[in-house]
């Protein structure tokens, strides 16, 4: 059941219109499974290349690189070694996706 919910959320994220929001929702979705809360934010200890992220959000690598720079500049995400750190709260769209997936 969890696998089908994850698939529904991943598909919904990939169809969201804005790449920066797709990336932010994906990172928070991954943080829900692998993230650890730290004083600076939620640390996601996954080696995720820009190409892999592009594949996961149905985009191109250059667009992902630009969107990650924008998210970093806005203070939503930062890179610490091989880990990503998410700052603030998860996007509200992610809660809506999760709720819709659970109603299935």
Q: Regions from the language model: what does each represent?
A:
Residues 32-104:
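Phosphate-/nucleic-acid-contacting segments
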């Amino acid at each position: 059941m969890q696998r089908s919910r994850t698939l529904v959320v991943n598909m919904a994220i990939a169809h969201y219109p804005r790449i920066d929001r797709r990336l932010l929702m994906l990172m928070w979705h991954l943080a829900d499974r692998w993230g650890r809360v730290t004083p600076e934010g939620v640390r996601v200890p996954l080696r995720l290349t820009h190409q892999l992220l592009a594949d996961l959000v149905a985009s191109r690598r250059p667009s992902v690189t630009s969107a990650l720079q924008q998210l970093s500049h806005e203070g939503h995400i930062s890179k610490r070694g091989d880990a990503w750190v998410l700052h603030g709260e998860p996007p509200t769209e992610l809660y809506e996706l999760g709720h819709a997936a659970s109603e299935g």
